Amino acid sequence: PDWKQTFEPHPAEMLFDLEKDPDELHDLSAIPEYAETLYKMRQALSDHIRTTHDLGFFLPNSRTGHILYEKVRKEKYPLDELYGLVEIAGTATVASLPMLEKALASPLPEMRFWGVVGYANLARENQINTCPQALLALLQDENPYIASEAAYAVVYLGKAQEGIARLITPAQEKDRKIGYSSLECLSLDPEMRDYIRPFLSELKEAAENLPRLANEDAGLMARGILVNL
């Protein structure tokens, strides 16, 4: 059914004819006759990101304590390198692994994050099936967004116990919702639900005892995960 599309994984690129399909239900990106249109729009977007020095690919906590616009210019942040990595991460193939592996070791958190995203996409698409140690090590990254994305990725690479345990138990309580967000994505995948079920008691306790009034309260998120299971 059409409504289900919102809750299913999407490719990095989708193309819609908004005149004929205003609800964006029919993706045209894989249809050969639209290949030229897709290429032109991809290039236009790529150019726009670079022309505007888009900061939308930075992690939410990268904006704390300073003005990000000023920081990236003062420190001469390698924005072009970041943009290239982001574009690769969404459409990664095994040929992209050297770039992704390099990103995992970067001192810049955004590079590590998008490197992990690339691995996660490869893993979910079954293009790779072994978990590199560098990726597993990022479960302990000091940045909760990186640790959460790494946990999501390793679940698809034979490390379900380690990954889900990391999402269930944050390093700091204030970061619980970040892990739950990734866990909710996993719970929407029927093939992942059996790996999550051993943690039902922890999720039930969270659903009963954590705040659950606002939309993104951890208790409410735990309830949503339980419903998916």
What function would you assign to each model-found segment?
Residues 7, 39-40, 48-51, 60-102:
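Extracellular/periplasmic ectodomains of large secreted or surface enzymes and adhesion receptors
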Residues 16, 25-29, 42-49, 101, ...:
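Non-transmembrane alpha-helical segments in soluble domains
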Residues 77-94, 110-126, 145-159, 177-194, ...:
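Structural detector for internal amphipathic alpha-helices that build alpha-solenoid repeat scaffolds
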Residues 104-110, 139-145, 170-177, 205-217:
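Short coil turns that connect the paired helices of HEAT/ARM alpha-solenoid repeats
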Residues 1-30, 36-39, 68:
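C-terminal, low-complexity/hydrophilic appendages and adjacent surface loops
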Residues 93-105, 125-139, 159-171, 192-208:
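Amphipathic alpha-helical scaffolding segments comprising HEAT/armadillo-like alpha-solenoid repeats
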